[in-house]
């Protein structure tokens, strides 16, 4: 079939090297670590020890112990719904669903099939001859005949097989529970649990990698290849990504931390062709919680993160970063009556205005000056371009000029008019007084004089964590377009100037508003080109209708997002066919997604999330964090208010407030 291949282990992989343990060393120490410590083996009355660990062995070595029927896979009810099947291998109960430390040893002995069948023919004849003396001989003959008929009619290969489960613990009491757990899991397969105490040393010896030749033949049973393969385990536990970059998630079954790279390693392997991400999760599914968890770890690994939000989801994290960096980072832009949002588009820290900075200033002035349905003439564009260039030249020459919109306005009013007069520029080509009149609300004393005249010398290029909170202005026809241009300019500036540094722009629900305000082309440009600048664009949405109704989402965002992240979709289970078709999900991926949060461990507090990479790799992980992280990310208003009050009480020390709040909750 090509789905399974065998790879011969090298000598170093078997016996190890000076720095890395081989598979034999790992087996003898019951460890998967590359620096395994060899343990003493000791045999006692009815028991065997490896180091401090006592072994417990269950075997499937007798046909009477086997299930009445086997299959390649079975439906796992706990993670299945009436609209989806979660399929696991038949032997999954002793594999990934058995949560203690254990090894499953499976043997297939490919003997001479024809010789085996001849022996069975002879045995059947003997049984027939002796059937008059014992009914059991007659019954055995019938079983052998049935085996032979199956082999000849279907052309099956006769083989011998064996399966055993070797578990261990350094605590005898715990080992008793483990023994019961293994027995219960075997019973789930409808097999008869057989706890083997006599043959433990022999079977342990035979299971040494490469030593199956010493396997005791009497411990095997005859079957066919097809049936024996049904005892193979098709699942594995979660493995850490072999990459220095990534985020920390959790194994959904065991709670074990997993290092997961969803950006660099998949790009290197060719699993994905871009780092963009599309995140879908209804309200309350833990969507913002997961994105907080993700961007914090990206930020801590050197990424420049720019977030556009409409719900204060990242306020706690931003405030924490702001406090930790003593105000150097964690910049939070939001609009409030007593503290309105303010920028200074004319300020750059290094004093260098490159072409893109000049173009962004011109675009900003044009947005203030002209309506969407009122394009500027060529003469107006030239006049404005000259005005911007001359003003920036004045700033470069004269350090006493403070760059701001106010000084730009005064330059147009007091100096640029004379220049236009000298050039004999006609009023109909550029109406300077009309221009000043339209821009007056943004000048000193005007209604929006705060907007472009910030006195904070803030260069966003070198700020690594920036949040634009647009909830209060997303419907404001004056403020919203200006802020979106600032956002656009900020990220493009980072994209082009920060060579070799990872950049991420994350658009929460704000993408809907942005896509309406002439920013649709920017989104298209962003998603198609950001990968060339070691960047990634992330869109987060919660409504299925948003995906279905938006041409930008369907045509640009989804098609250019090789990493898709979905949270609990049970709310949309009746609409999931549309989601599946739109995202191009396979039936297996559908089953994985609909299994999210179906069988959560009540003793742990976590939400599950599905991650799909390039349509070829996918898995469900858990977002499980400490109480400290929880209170940093929470979007529950009562919890946020509790944290804010404690922060104020502690003089603005949010980190200490988080620690105290988490500690108080643990003690309850």
For every predicted segment, state its role.
Residues 1-235:
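Extended, folded cores of ATP/NTP-driven motor/assembly subunits in large transport
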Residues 586-647:
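Conserved P-loop NTPase
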Residues 70-96, 298-326:
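Gly/lys/ser-thr-rich phosphate-binding loops in alpha/beta enzymes
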Residues 94-99, 191-192, 203-258, 264, ...:
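P-loop NTPase motor domains
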Residues 279-303, 645-668:
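A short, charged
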Residues 2-10, 106-108, 189-202, 329-339, ...:
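A generic structural motif
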Residues 263-285, 289-297, 305-315, 331-339, ...:
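Conserved P-loop NTPase motor cores
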Residues 154-167, 278, 463-467, 504:
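Glycine-rich, often proline-containing surface loops adjacent to acidic residues and nearby aromatics
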């Amino acid at each position: 079939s090509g789905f399974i291949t065998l790879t011969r282990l090298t000598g170093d992989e078997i016996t190890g090297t000076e720095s890395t343990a081989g598979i034999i060393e790992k087996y003898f120490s019951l460890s998967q670590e590359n620096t395994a410590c060899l343990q003493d083996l000791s045999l006692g009355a009815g028991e065997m020890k490896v180091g401090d660990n006592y072994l417990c062995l269950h075997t499937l070595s007798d046909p009477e112990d086997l299930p009445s029927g086997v299959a390649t896979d079975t439906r796992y009810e706990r993670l299945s719904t009436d609209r989806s099947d979660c399929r696991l291998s038949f032997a999954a109960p002793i594999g990934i669903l058995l949560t203690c430390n254990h090894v499953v040893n499976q043997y297939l002995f490919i003997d001479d099939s024809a010789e085996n069948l001849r022996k069975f023919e002879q045995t059947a004849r003997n049984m027939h001859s002796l059937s008059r003396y014992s009914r059991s001989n007659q019954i055995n003959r019938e079983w052998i005949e049935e085996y032979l008929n199956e082999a000849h009619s279907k052309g099956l290969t006769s083989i011998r097989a064996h399966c055993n489960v070797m578990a261990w613990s350094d605590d005898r009491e715990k080992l008793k529970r483990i023994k019961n757990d293994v027995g219960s899991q075997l019973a789930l397969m409808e097999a008869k649990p057989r706890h083997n105490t006599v043959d433990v040393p022999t079977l342990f010896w035979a299971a040494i990698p490469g030593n199956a030749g010493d396997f005791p033949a009497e411990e095997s049973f005859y079957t066919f290849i097809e049936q024996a393969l049904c005892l193979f385990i098709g699942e594995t536990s979660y493995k850490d990504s072999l990459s220095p970059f990534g985020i920390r998630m959790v194994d959904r079954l065991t709670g074990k931390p997993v290092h997961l790279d969803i950006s660099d390693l998949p790009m290197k392997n060719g699993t994905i062709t871009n780092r963009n991400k599309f995140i879908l999760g209804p309200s309350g599914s833990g969507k913002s919680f997961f994105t907080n968890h993700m961007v914090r770890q990206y930020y801590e690994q050197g990424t420049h993160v720019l977030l556009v939000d409409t719900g204060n989801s990242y306020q706690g994290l931003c405030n924490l970063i702001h406090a930790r960096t003593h105000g150097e980072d964690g910049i939070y832009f939001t609009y409030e009556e007593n503290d309105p949002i303010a920028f200074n588009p004319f300020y750059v820290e290094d004093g260098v205005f490159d072409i893109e900075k000049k173009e962004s200033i011109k675009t900003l002035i044009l947005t203030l000056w002209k309506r969407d349905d009122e394009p500027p003439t060529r003469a107006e564009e030239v006049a404005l371009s000259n005005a911007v260039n001359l003003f920036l030249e004045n700033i470069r020459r004269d350090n006493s000029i403070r760059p701001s919109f106010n000084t730009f306005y005064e330059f147009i009013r007091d100096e640029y008019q004379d220049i236009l007069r000298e050039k004999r520029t006609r009023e109909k080509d550029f109406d300077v007084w009309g221009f000043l009149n339209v821009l007056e609300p943004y000048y000193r004393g005007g209604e929006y004089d705060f907007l472009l005249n910030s006195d904070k010398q803030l260069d966003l290029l070198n700020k690594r964590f920036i949040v634009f909170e647009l909830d209060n202005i997303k419907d404001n026809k004056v403020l919203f377009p200006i802020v979106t241009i600032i956002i656009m300019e900020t990220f493009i500036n980072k994209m082009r100037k920060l060579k070799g540094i990872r950049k991420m722009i994350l658009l929460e629900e704000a993408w809907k508003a942005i896509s309406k305000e002439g920013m649709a082309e920017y989104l298209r440009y962003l998603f198609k080109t950001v990968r060339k600048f070691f960047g990634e664009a992330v869109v987060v949405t919660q409504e299925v209708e948003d995906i279905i109704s938006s041409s930008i989402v369907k045509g640009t965002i989804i098609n250019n997002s090789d990493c898709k992240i979905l949270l609990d979709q049970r709310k949309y289970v009746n609409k999931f066919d549309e989601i599946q078709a739109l995202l191009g999900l396979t039936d297996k991926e559908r089953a994985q997604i609909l299994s999210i949060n179906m069988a959560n461990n009540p003793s742990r507090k976590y939400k599950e999330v599905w991650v799909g990479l390039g349509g070829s790799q996918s898995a469900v992980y858990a977002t499980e964090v400490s109480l400290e992280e929880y209170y940093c990310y929470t979007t529950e208003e009562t919890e946020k208010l509790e944290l804010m009050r404690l922060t104020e009480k502690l003089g603005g020390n949010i980190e200490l407030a988080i620690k105290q709040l988490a500690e108080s909750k643990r003690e309850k």
